[in-house]
Structure formats: structure tokens, C-alpha cells
Amino acid sequence: MKAVIFIMDGLGDRPNKDGNTPLKEAKTPVMDKMAKEGICGLMNAVDIGVRPGSDTAHLAILGYDPYTTYTGRGPFEACGVGVTVKPGDIAFRCNFSTVDENFTVMDRRAGRIENTLELEKELDGLKIDDVDIIFKESGGYRAALVLRGPGLSDKISDADPKKEGKKVKDINPLDDSKEAKKTAEIVNKLLKIAYEKLDKHPVNEERRKQNLPVANMIVPRGVGQVPEIMQFTEKTGLKGACIAGTGLIKGIAKMVGLDVIDVEGCDGTPNSDFMAKAFAIVKTLEDYDFILVNVKGADEAGHDGNYELKKEIIERIDGMLDYITKNINKDEVYIAMSGDHSTPIEEMDHSADPLPIVIWGKSVRVDDVEKFDEFSTYKGGLNWIKGTNIMPILMDLMSIAKKYGA
């Protein structure tokens, strides 16, 4: 038996004034068919009432306790874009952002700039005091930053003010150690250098001519040291792969030992080639026991408050599932389908609202649920579970779970 965990990033939502969500209103005949043929329920990736990041959510969904394995998003982001992180490295995720001359943030995502490779070159390879700067763009406005050198610490604050109209925050040490103080000073120096190098860069001068937000600042957050994590194959006995478009999810996969399958045209944006990803899933199942799949577009739409786009993306994902379910053997493959978190249109951010989940395959106890949405699956046989329950349930269905006790 094989298994797929199919995650629609940012899937869940809250009802609008008409009582609808993008998922409830979307035309999703395949998801609904899977709900009718599967066992359904509700799922909180980390815990009830906890707003998860995509990082902690995916760790939990893969069966890892995020409270003991998560050190910050930075190491995963860096790993996902190909940086070989080492013990002692301090890693951050970053946004390219638009700031004024006072470092007040005008656009947190620099107008969702698409190509930042030339800007990356201005920062990657710098050396500040005795610390090497490794900087890699990770798709659009996202990037990863790694500090490598002696005497560093991850006990420092973030620069992200979280909202536009506020200044980029000074980095401060969070304890009294000389390592934290040194690291904070290095990052503060880097931010000043970044503004000086990026503000008048030809890429940004051209964006000004087009009245587009410039990418003249990097805003580090999610600092962390590289965690020690048991490898997925050792933990489960399964040969695992990951198909995802974003650097963060690829980084999590690499960190736990999943093979990352790159799919041309899949970059983690709403414009990704969803069907190419569907074809890759079916093909990859020929060689692997397990696949983690992440499809990102609905989350982007939620963050932008775009109801219609989120609905459209969910319908496109349904088309993916049509191909997948028609081209795999239901007697040989289980699919656990859900989201990693809700990204409600009204919040334009992650929330703790539970997600619909269905497990589809030959030996599940089919329940009475007939539609896959936030308002229907609570009636299902899975009841209300956490993300860390998914892998044990799948392994039990696959007859590879170890017995607890005599």
C-alpha cells in the first residue's frame, strides 16, 4: 500500500454574509465524491485554537511534534532553496519589501515582485565583520538569509513590523549573551547595507518608471538554528517524496529526508501549472511509498482577500484530483486530503479555524458525509483530529503500524 497526503495550502475560510466560503461555493465534484467514498472529519494541524504557520503545520502533518522540532522558519526556507545549512548557522526567511527613506514599510511584499535574482546578487556573498552572508531568493518576494560565522545566536528579535505604515524593526538580542548581541548587530548592519544597495538598483529604477512598488529592503523573520530531526524513512519505514512549489515546503521535506520532485511550471503561485503537478504525482507513485503534496494558490488568494480567486483555485485543484483519482488504483493508494491551515478572506492571514479532512481508499469506514467543505465533514467518522494523527492513521490503514502493548 501507498499513501498521499494532499495539502491545499490555506484551504479553510470563514462564512461571508451569505454563509458561504470559497470551498463551499466552489464546484468540486471530485472532492465531494471523495468525501462520499471516504471517511471525513475536522483537523487542526497543530492544535485546537492554535494559528499555525505553514511550517509547523506541515511538520505536524508529517507526524512530527512541532513543539519539540521547530526552531524557526528560517532553516527550512534556506534548506528549501538549496542552501546547505550547517550546525551553528543562523537562518531567516525574508521578504523583499518596499520602504521609504525612514524604513517605513509601504508594501510588505514589494508589489509581489516576481523576479529578484538580480537583487539577490547584491547581497549574497557579503561579509560583515567575521560573518559570511548567504542570501538566496526563494520565489517572488520571498528569500532566505543565512549567517555563518563564530559566536552567533538565534536569540534575537524579528525585523518584521507585520503591518504596512510601520517602520522595519531594529533587531534586538533576546538574552544577555554576547552571541545574541553580536548577531543582532550584524543583522542591523545588513539591513542598512541592503537599502543602500537595492534602492537605486536598475531593477528598482525600472519599477519606479512603471509605477510599481520597489524591492528596496529585506525584512528578516523566522530566525532559527538547524534542528535535529529523525528522518522520515527511519520513523515510518516508507520511501517518501515531496511535490511542492514553495521553498519552505521543499525545505521541510529535505530536512526530514523526503526526496523533492521538482515539477516544471510549479512555483507556488496561483499561476502554477496544477495539472503538471497532478501528472507528476501519478508518475512519482510508481517509485515511492509516500508523497507529501502541497498546492499553494488558495493561500495566496486568502492573504490578498480575493474570494473569487480562492474559489477559482479550489476548482482548478478539483481538476487535478480528477486526473489523480482516475489514474491510480484505489485498492493500492490512500489519499488524505485537507489543508495546513485556514486563511480566511476576512482575516487575510492564518487562523485557527479547523479544516475539513477526508481519507480516501479501500478500507476506510465510509460515513454519511456527502460534501467536502467546512460545514459538512464534522459529521464524519474521523471526528476532530490533529495533524500529528494523520500519519499514524495512514500507517494503520496500510497495515504497517506497530502494535502498542502486548
UniProtKB/Swiss-Prot annotation:
InterPro entries, alphabetized: Alkaline_phosphatase_core_sf, ApgAM_prokaryotes, Metalloenzyme, Pglycerate_mutase_ApgM
PANTHER family in the cross-refs: COFACTOR-INDEPENDENT PHOSPHOGLYCERATE MUTASE, METALLOENZYME DOMAIN-CONTAINING PROTEIN
Pathway the protein takes part in: Carbohydrate degradation; glycolysis; pyruvate from D-glyceraldehyde 3-phosphate: step 3/5
Gene Ontology BP annotations: glycolytic process
Function noted in UniProt: Catalyzes the interconversion of 2-phosphoglycerate and 3-phosphoglycerate.
Entry-linked CDD domains: iPGM_like
Gene name linked to the record: apgM
Annotated protein name in UniProt: 2,3-bisphosphoglycerate-independent phosphoglycerate mutase
